[in-house]
Amino acid sequence: MKICWKWYIIELYEYNLFLGVYKINMKRILKRFGSYLKHVDKILPIICIAITVFDIFLINSMVDNGIINAATARTQRIAAVIGIVGGFIVSLVDYKFLSKWWFTFAPIALILQMLLFVPSLRIKIDDDMAWLQLGRFTLQPSEITKFVFIITLATHISKLGDKINSLPHLLLVGVHGLFPMGLIMIQGDAGSALVFLFIFICMLFMGGLSWKYIVLGLSAVPLIGYVAWNYIMQDHHRKRFLILFDKEMQQEELLDAYLQQYRGTIALGSGQLTGLGFESDNYTYTPFIENDFVFSYIGMTLGFIGCMAVVIALAVLCLKLLSNASGAPDQLGKLMCVGVFAMVFFHSVINIGMVLSVIPVIGIPLPFLSQGGTSMMMMHICMGLVVSTTCHKEKVKHMFYTEKD
């Protein structure tokens, strides 16, 4: 009987000890979370979530109008929630910690890209094999690779510092940038390859690249253009460029290569100033309007006013990203912010340019608005990376903080 009482006392003591430790840990977590909320950039997430809510509204209206099915809309909503939560989690982690672990992210991104060469796993559209089929879901690896590319390239350039203008080091940085571009080009996704190129150029410039290399690069543009036009681009790529300036070709390709852009331009203008609303019977059919041509749908339903509101929102987002870059505490943080800015800016300008028929159709989605789960998720996660650079300026004790940090 005495032994039983002893065991009871020991268990009771251990239970109270556990409760005490639990209370201490909870207090510590709440304190750190309060510190996080104090330092975190609240404006950037609000902008992104506001645009996302607007997108969900658009997607639901497309379901009501029979443009997409309910399952597609549900996938987009789930992707938005996962992206927002993922972005929040990334923002909790110090961006310097993410930089140190680049060697774990890079192989994952590479494996996902290489899986596109497995015929049974990929979805091939024309010559573009940019999507993986994983059970009931599709995944676009290049969107994940953009996030990893920004982290790895920022880490590489920040570690070099002034050595970036040393030719051997610059050549290694060039290999770092050209490898994912080349891999994605082989897979037929020229649009994503151009996004990587723009990110690469902007981050190089931010990294302190010498003007002599910049001038040399600009002088080589005609030669690079000639080689790309004659030896890299395929016939359908060249046709998309030529069709913008050739009225006769536009008529010939009205039901083929020029169909989406032609119908998208008509849909965009049909809304005039205030749009046709969400219950009109006079919608203009545009192939895949929910994807790369969602800006046409906005113009058709909400008119010029709706389009300008979207342009202003994206412009404010880009300016906020640049502001965060200027306020980042070190070169690594600045490079990460500039990389995300370059991605959002290029996506926005090229996508709207495609709809306005001033840029060829190259399959680049409009940030936070085009239907596409992977793009939606990774956009929010990239924003979480930018937020991390602002809320970890000081030694903020975040959730993953240790005394060794």
Language-model features, listed with the residues they occupy:
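Hydrophobic alpha-helical segments of polytopic membrane proteins
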Residues: 83-85, 103-110, 165-185, 190-230, ...
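Tryptophan (W) side chains
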Residues: 5-7
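Hydrophobic transmembrane alpha-helices and their immediate junctions
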Residues: 305-348
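Transmembrane alpha-helix boundary/anchor motif
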Residues: 93, 152, 232, 236, ...
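Hydrophobic, glycine- and aromatic-enriched re-entrant/interface helices and adjoining loop segments
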Residues: 127-131, 215-309, 329-333
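Membrane-helix boundary/helix-loop-helix interface segments in multi-pass membrane proteins
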Residues: 25-46, 50-51, 57-187, 342, ...
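Short hydrophobic targeting helices and cationic amphipathic motifs
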Residues: 17-19
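Interfacial segments of multi-pass membrane proteins
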Residues: 157, 194, 199-213, 282-306, ...
